[in-house]
């Protein structure tokens, strides 16, 4: 799988969110007096069988007080044969679909960025990273979002029964294809632990030899990156 160029990421993830775009957008609008909207589209991640492409659209609402700004996102799954689109949204605490107009209870200052990171080897499941944080705080952690084609089911998972402040999604488990690998730790501490988590949230210590794996091809197109202002 082709990896994107190295980019800034709050958790030093191997699958960085477009944090440099978030920071650059804030720098471009230092004196806003009313909310502004900006948009970004991720590269597409094409399944190994070439049938599907997954990509995310990100909306940033910039407020005069940057700590009240919001970043929200949604994942699109496109059938490349039929052109049909399916929307995938995480069920994590800050997740919200910014492209569906409705009253939102999501608090101000939230950051929720979903990006596709890996297909399964057979192309029947996709793994996405849901990065969540709060502007102006040290709160930051990952969730895994797994879409399963056979059941058309979406699962949002993170390590459970484990004490940590930050979790970083690493990819599929190389030893157990139905599980994903996370690395967890506490802010300011060097010690890290690795965990294998299934779609039910069951969490076990990862085998030392278990290495993360990813499948799929990242494809850039003319729509990738910052988009026209909405």
Where are the regions that the model predicts?
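Sequence signature of WD/YWTD-type beta-propeller architectures
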Residues: 1-230
